[in-house]
């Protein structure tokens, strides 16, 4: 495989009904405890050697669809941590951008890790910042975020991911065709460029080359891969969105720069130019499917104010706890949906 990403190297149980602030705090703290910080005087953080959360848990006959949204993925992180705490693991997960990164931790059975990383490194310019873009050509620092953190600072359990019974696909966009690229990731380490591509935002990221394909963020071509999920033949689909009801995407104000930057990829430019039409139409379809009872949607209950490169840890934690709360609130209905 030729992969080149153009970069340098109940308490154990969340609330089942309307949660209180105290319950949510306990649930969030419990999730974070899945990763252990170093002892004082220790040289490196070491991940606690715990069994993956999916160990000995039967999979639910359902698919999980995860929208992206950069730091808005904190909402998704909260939802998935609640699922893991309740031992809900789906047979198939498909994620875009931040949704793919959160999905990777879900597949590895690592509750707490997605939010831990975002909050812990939010103020570190090496993680996600315009300073990183100026220095490396990537706002989302590839060497730091995809190597130093998972390999040294807060180790990712690659073996747990490899052993996971959950099928996982990451979505990126092929620049030459303008179409979505759905890649089944079986080995997180060896196929990491597909995760990097999925979360490489246009203009502020270098193009990723993987198996001869030129790739960038999957949100441009398939922001919410519900159709992909349906094509698997599954009857149940849980969709986690990162925008509240009523959200409407506006035309891209940076299209002039996009056309200049990606002049060699006309199909990709077309996709960028008309993305707001496709996105808004997709959201309307999702709402119709939800009303018809064919899918189950979890989304923020109010407009999200967290920015794509948010550094305010209080806002990030609030959005994470909102995800926990919304998943807890909808849990009885979700159980009914899955049992029907």
Region locations from a protein language model:
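Patatin-like phospholipase
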Residues: 2-96, 104-340
């Amino acid at each position: 495989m030729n992969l080149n990403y153009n970069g340098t190297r109940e308490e154990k149980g969340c609330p089942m009904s309307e949660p209180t602030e105290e319950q949510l705090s306990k649930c969030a703290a419990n999730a974070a405890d899945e990763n252990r910080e170093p002892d004082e005087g220790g040289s490196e953080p070491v991940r606690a050697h715990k069994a993956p959360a999916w160990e000995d848990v039967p999979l639910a006959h359902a698919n999980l669809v995860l929208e992206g949204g950069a730091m808005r993925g904190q909402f998704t992180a909260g939802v998935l941590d609640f699922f893991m705490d309740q031992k809900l693991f789906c047979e198939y997960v498909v994620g875009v951008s931040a949704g793919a990164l959160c999905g990777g931790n879900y597949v590895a059975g690592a509750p707490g890790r997605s939010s831990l990383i975002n909050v812990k490194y939010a103020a570190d310019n090496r993680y996600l910042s315009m300073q990183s873009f100026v220095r490396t050509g990537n706002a989302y620092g590839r060497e730091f975020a995809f190597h130093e953190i998972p390999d040294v600072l807060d180790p990712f359990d690659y073996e747990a991911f490899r052993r996971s019974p959950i099928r996982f696909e990451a979505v990126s966009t092929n620049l030459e065709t303008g179409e979505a690229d759905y890649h089944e990731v079986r080995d997180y380490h060896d196929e990491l460029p597909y995760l990097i591509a999925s979360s490489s935002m246009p203009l502020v990221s270098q193009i990723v080359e993987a198996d001869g394909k030129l790739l960038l963020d999957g949100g441009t071509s398939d922001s919410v891969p519900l159709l992909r999920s349906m094509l698997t033949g599954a009857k149940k689909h849980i969709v986690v969105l990162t925008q509240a009801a009523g959200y409407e995407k506006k035309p891209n104000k940076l299209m002039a720069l996009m056309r200049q930057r990606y002049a060699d990829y006309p199909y990709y430019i077309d996709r960028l130019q008309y993305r707001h039409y496709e996105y808004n139409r997709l959201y309307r379809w999702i709402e119709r499917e939800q009303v018809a009872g064919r899918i189950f949607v979890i989304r923020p209950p109010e407009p999200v104010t967290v920015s794509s490169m948010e550094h305010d840890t209080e806002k990030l934690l609030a959005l994470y706890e909102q995800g926990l709360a919304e998943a807890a609130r909808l849990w009885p209905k979700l159980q009914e949906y899955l049992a029907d």
